[in-house]
A protein has these predicted regions:
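Helical transmembrane-bundle signal
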Residues: 19-29, 75-82, 108-115, 141
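Membrane-interface interhelical connector segments
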Residues: 32-60
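Hydrophobic alpha-helical transmembrane segments of polytopic
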Residues: 11, 15-19, 68, 101-111
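Juxtamembrane transmembrane-helix termini
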Residues: 29-39, 82-95, 118-121, 151-154
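Cytoplasmic juxtamembrane regions at transmembrane-helix boundaries
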Residues: 2, 78-106
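Alpha-helical transmembrane segments of multi-pass integral membrane proteins
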Residues: 106-175
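N-terminal signal-anchor transmembrane alpha helix
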Residues: 5-36
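Individual transmembrane alpha-helix segments
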Residues: 58-75
Length: 175
């Protein structure tokens, strides 16, 4: 049975299955209760770094929490757009959803890398492991997406470029 799934598409679907629910839940918890949710396990490194190293007051800390939630929801939105694109076989075969996947991977990698660096600075080993794992998943998919190359467009193989019917005729006055 032939399949028309590209490796990067399949890997992107698996990543979307992880990141959409987890980052959506984390972002909505931040929206509901910014201070309480900011100090939970997925965000503790960012919260401690902001409060300890940047010495921000309560309102700027809440704004930073909302900014983190907005960034995570942006990644979730691009993963959702990728899933919508991947449902159509014609778009999936030509790699039409690769742009949405690439944007989700780029923004998600920046957020995970920054969170990992902040976890390293404040000494949160469990948060460091979580963000390093997320970063490795995102970078692994990005490498697969880059190595796989662009999708081949479907052309009519019956017509070749050497066919005389496709050549433009040259007239005496056209030279």
């Amino acid at each position: 049975m032939p399949t028309n799934w590209r490796i990067s598409s399949f890997n992107g679907v698996l990543l979307a299955a992880y990141f959409i629910p987890t980052w959506t839940i984390v972002a909505f918890k931040i929206m509901i209760s910014p201070v309480h949710a900011f100090y939970e396990r997925p965000n503790i490194a960012v919260a401690l770094f902001i409060s300890d190293h940047l010495h921000l007051a309560a309102m700027p800390t809440i704004r930073a929490a909302w900014l983190l939630a907005l960034g995570k929801l942006t990644v979730v939105a691009f993963f959702a757009i990728f899933l919508v694109f991947i449902t159509r076989a014609s778009i999936r075969k030509t790699g039409g959803g690769d742009e949405a996947l690439a944007i989700a991977l780029a923004i998600g990698s920046v957020i995970s890398f920054a969170s990992m660096v902040m976890a390293s600075e404040v000494g949160e080993t469990q948060a460091l492991r979580l963000h390093a794992t997320e970063l490795l998943m995102l970078l692994g998919t990005a490498i697969v997406l880059l190595v796989e190359g662009p999708a081949q467009s479907q052309t009519d193989r019956g017509v070749t470029s050497g066919d005389p019917a496709l050549e433009q005729s040259q007239l005496a006055y056209d030279r």
